[in-house]
Amino acid sequence: TSKVKIGRLITVAYLALCKNSRKTCPADKSDSIRWCPIDDLPRLPFDHKEIIEAAIQEIRNWVEKEPAIIFDYMPMKFTAFQLRRTYEVIYNREMDVRNFHKKMNSLDYVVPTDDMQDGVAHRAARYYRFDKVKYNQQRSKFNKI
């Protein structure tokens, strides 16, 4: 095998959030382009792993600065499990179910609906929705302090 010698290399990385239902475009013309779970990335060249780690930290910073960003990537109605799993993926750690429910229920802008899951083998979960008006009211109260 011969190694390619590279004098200098500049990597430009772009960061964007998109829903996980998004598919790669067939026009990409490459079989190697695919979505990968963050905890199961393929071996990456150069400093690309560090770039991805920095991007993940940046997403965490976005969520801490503006928590509503999470709800842009949730279905219109979602379960507590779906919301908790989203946070677990972002922060790469399991969260205590009871503590998460307490925290979630303390947020005025996460509103329970009358809808319940159907067609599931386990106890049906309640659906919630994000109330942007309540969120903005709460944020404006906080900003006045």
Regions found by a protein language model. Name each.
Residues K65-I145:
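Core RNA-modification/binding signature centered on pseudouridine synthases
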Residues L9-L17, T24-N61, M74-F81, N99-D108, ...:
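NUDIX/MutT-family hydrolases
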Residues K3, L41-L44, Q117:
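Alpha-helix initiation/capping motif
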Residues T1-R22, I56-Q57, R126-K134:
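Active-site-adjacent beta-strand/loop module that shapes the phosphate/pyrophosphate-binding cleft
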Residues T1, W35-D40, P67-I69:
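Short acidic, glycine/Ser/Thr-rich loop/turn "cap" segments at secondary-structure junctions
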